Amino acid sequence: MLFIELLKAIFFGVIEGVTEWLPISSTGHLILVQEFIRLHQDKAFMEMFNIVIQLGAIIAVIVIYFERLNPFQPGKSPQQIRLTWQLWLKVAIACIPSIIIAVPLDDWFEAHFNHMLPIAIALIVYGVAFLWIEKRHQTLEPRVVKLSRMSYKTAFFIGCFQVLSIIPGTSRSGATILGAIILGASRTVAADFTFFLAIPTMFGYSGLKALKFFIDGNHLTLSQLLVLLVASLTAFAVSLYVIKLLTDYVKKHDFTVFGRYRIVLGSLLIVYSVFKSLF
């Protein structure tokens, strides 16, 4: 039984590692996959699992970008150190809207929108948004082509877009990438800032979910701990590849393919929801 659970954990880790960074909603995909492949765990654990599993993906960002994000990295010039601290300040500023808005409202949105139909609608809405924005920006030159040129004001408004991801199916990376592009950032800058913003956002969110799990009187069994560790380690390994793949992809392509994917998947899920309610 535990062996089967660990195999499922590996599968969920792969899903998380791929969908956390592509703008197609990792939490939405995990919830959808669990319609067909279920871990034999209680509801409280699964609610925590769907979020904390993202830590593996976040650690992959730290590993890949450690030198760039570390202001104490040996060999950095004073100017590079200053730019690194400025980057972290921009990330901190971008976190403010989520702290003020998303954290207090998270439980309410999870209770009312953490279902297949709202997820499907969110997939379609943001899929259409990606297609519209990419078409609109085809002839426009981005104003922000380097992270060092991003203003603190722009960082704050990107953080405001991140708040939209409180709705399951939206995609945190999708919301911030869309916001960054709308605000004049290049696709490369949008993707990079999304990666960096994920570090404090998801560490904080995962920490709150884990804390709530234990405050509510729940305890991790050994099998649950193994499932969580295996899924997180798998998400970490897969993310190492997917992050590099996406950074290479956005240098030559736009996000249209992800918009189309979201629309197709969302439409299929609506059809599935209708049939499920009828039969």
From Swiss-Prot:
One of its GO terms (molecular function) is undecaprenyl-diphosphatase activity. Bacitracin is thought to be involved in the inhibition of peptidoglycan synthesis by sequestering undecaprenyl diphosphate, thereby reducing the pool of lipid carrier available. Keywords: Antibiotic resistance, Cell membrane, Cell shape, Cell wall biogenesis/degradation, Hydrolase, Membrane, Peptidoglycan synthesis, Transmembrane, Transmembrane helix. It is a multi-pass membrane protein. Belongs to the UppP family. It catalyses: di-trans,octa-cis-undecaprenyl diphosphate + H2O = di-trans,octa-cis-undecaprenyl phosphate + phosphate + H(+). Its EC number is 3.6.1.27. Catalyzes the dephosphorylation of undecaprenyl diphosphate (UPP). Confers resistance to bacitracin. One of its GO terms (biological process) is regulation of cell shape. This is Undecaprenyl-diphosphatase. The chain crosses the membrane at residues 2-22, 44-64, 85-105, 113-133, 163-183, 188-208, 225-245, 255-275. The keyword Transmembrane applies. GO terms for cellular component: plasma membrane. It is found in: Cell membrane. The lineage of its organism: Bacteria, Bacillati, Bacillota, Bacilli, Lactobacillales.
